[in-house]
Each structure stands twice: as C-alpha cells, then as structure tokens.
Amino acid sequence: GGWKVTIHGPLELVRYLESCYSVTGQRAFDAEFWGDQTYEREMRIIHAPTPADMPVAADGAGSAVALDWKGWRIGFDLGASDRKVAVAKDGKLALRPDGEPVLSEEYVWDPRPQTNIQWHFDHIMEILKEAEKAIKAIDPNARVEAIGGSSAGVYVNGRVRVASLFRGITPRERFDREAAPIFQNIQKAWGIPLRLENDGDVTALAGSIALNDGAVLGLAMGSSLAGGYVDEHRAIKGWMNELAFAPVDYNPRAAVDEWSRDFGVGANYFSQQAVARLIPLAGIDMPDIPADAFPLRLKRVQDLMAAGDARARKIYETIGVYFGYSVAHYCDFYKPVRHIEVLGRVVTGEGGQVILDKAKDVIRREFPELLNINFYEPDEREKRHGQAAAAASLPLT
C-alpha cells in the first residue's frame, strides 16, 4: 500500500499512469482507496528524471512479533458475525489443569448495521472484560500486560481506514471522527499496549506458530478471499494483503467485481461466489435455491461431491487449476514462501482435497521450482482458538 508512487522511466508512461490514477481516470477507485480513504492523502504518481531522484527502497523488515513473552495477555478476533476472545499466558493459549482453555470463546454480534460507534466500543470492551474476569478467577492479583487483536479491514497505525464492521458509521467525516480512533480509545481505556492487525496476517501468524516456522502465506476461501503473510523471521510486513481485490485473471472478459469494478480479482475465483459462478457451467441446475444464496449453493455442491457427482468434482478441479496458477503468481510477490495455509468453507470436505490435488498437479507440471511448498490445513482446535491466541502475541512490550 502507499499513496505516492515514484517512477523513473519514460515521461509519457508516467503521465499516462497519472491520468489513470486520478478522480476521472480508469483507476479512480484505486486512487480514492489508497489516497484519501487509506492514507488520508491525495494519491500521486511522480516522475523521477534520473535514478538519483528515486527514493531509497523501504521494503523493510516488517513489524516484529515476540513469541516468547511472559505474563497474562488477551487476544481477540472480530468477524462479521462473531467476536472471538482468548486468554494467553507466557507465549501461548492459557490452559486449565484439564487441558481446556482458560477462556477461548465466541460471542455473537451483528456490527454492520449499527450506526452508533458506542455500540461497537461497548461490545468489544465486553469481551475484553470477560477475559480479564477469567484471568482474575485464576489469579486475583494478576494484571493484563497487553492486548492484541485481529479484524477484517485496513488499519494504518492503529486507525481504522476501511472496514465493513463499521460501515454503518456514515458519512465519511463522521467515520474519520468516531470509527477511525476506536482501537486507540480502547487502548486508552485499558492503559496498556494494544496492537491491531489485519485478520489475514494474523491467520498466517497463527499458522506460523502452529508450524513453528516462518514464510507462511495464509489464504482463506469463504464468502470472499482473505490473504495474509509472515516472512521467514515471522514478522508481519504491514503490507495490504487484500488478495480478494488483486487480479489473478488478466482476461479482459473475466468476471467483474461489484465493489471495485475491477476484473479477474481473487474474490471471484476463490470464494463461495466462485463456486456459484461455475455451477451452471458444470451443468448443475438448482431452481430451488436463489442465485445469490451462495452459502446454500456451496452446501448443495458439497453434498453432490460427497455423493460422487462428477459435475461437482469438475467445479473443484477448475478452482484447483485456478489455484495452482495463482499460487505461482503470488510467489512472484511474496518471497520466500515455504508454507501455504489453506482454510475456509470452500476447501471444507472432499472438494477441498480435490482443489489442493489439482493445484499441486499444475505446480508439478508448470512450476517445478515451487514443488517444495507445503500446503497446510489447520486442525479444528487451531481454527477455533488459533487466531485470537496468535493475536495476543502482537504487542511488543
């Protein structure tokens, strides 16, 4: 992500890109997204006449994560339909003597239609207080040392910039005033370190902790595509890994995303809507299920797959081919990648194995240099507890 792009190259090319990334250009959506929405600056494309005029590269080491911390911490994960919270101690999920977590719970909520930011604040504080109560029940003298959180959306320096959880807070001026600083306000209320990161990156961190290794690209195929990455040092890079809106298909006739109006983006190829798009092409008719009921349509395909239906298998094989080529494409940008963590409803059941087998087949034939990549699926325990517990490792104290 960034609001300023500096290019040393032909002036005509830079002028052309400048016109594309303007309020009236063909990339107006991106110009607004990366400019005012994300970085609160106007997006600029700048020409560097000579190599000496180029700024020094700042790829950087990313943002370190300490995995060997001591004391009590709280980790949370905010989704569209539930809030997860976990208690962690001395670098890992805190367990009772019987091996069960001290606290690792899901609490239902419906934040998107809410128009009062106090509602969001209170509901997040509620789960943090529940976690503190669980800690105090074990050790009345204990002190929460830090809080880490993960949430869908774009966050810059702890401020909310783009997040569907707060879509009810409008117009934009009110969003910037009330929603943007919500996590900074929660941190002030607790008076201890609090760090929030994108949920895709925290998913990759959870995978890295489970695998005890770095260089993990996490991909979740659900209602959309979520992505995240931790490098070989297990650092979160601070990149905008919004792979749902990054193109994987450059065919001009590729499916168009309804939000960004871009074509060929990951959300249309690795999600429930990708399955729904392939259903008629596979020759499957579902007159009893509305066309936009993607979860129900996916469930029907999963049932057909379990019953041995060859048409359903074709859908998963097709997504597997997409996936094989896209993995190779992603590996041009994410370096190194030793593990790819795959999760989400689309890869649940027999069909998920077909997707992975087909993807590996594509990689074997087309990209043998990537054969050593390990595809990893988290187990049920990690899915339930891993994300919130990993989030607890985010703050550096």
For each predicted feature, which ranges?
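Short glycine-rich phosphate-binding loop at a beta-alpha junction
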Residues: 2-10, 141-152, 334-346
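Glycine/GP-enriched mid-protein hinge/lid loop-to-helix segment characteristic of carbohydrate kinases
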Residues: 1, 16, 24-30, 59-72, ...
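Helical "lid/coupling" subdomains associated with nucleotide-phosphate turnover
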Residues: 1, 230-231, 241, 245-262, ...
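Glycine-rich phosphate-binding loop and adjoining helix at the ATP-binding site
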Residues: 11-50, 106-129, 142-147, 153-216, ...
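Phosphate/pyrophosphate-binding loops at sites that engage ATP/ADP/AMP, CoA/4′-phosphopantetheine
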Residues: 125-146, 327-339
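A short acidic Gly-Thr/Ser loop motif
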Residues: 9-10, 68-70, 76-82, 219-224, ...
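Short loop/turn segments at strand-loop or loop-helix junctions that form parts
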Residues: 8-10, 79, 90, 97-102, ...
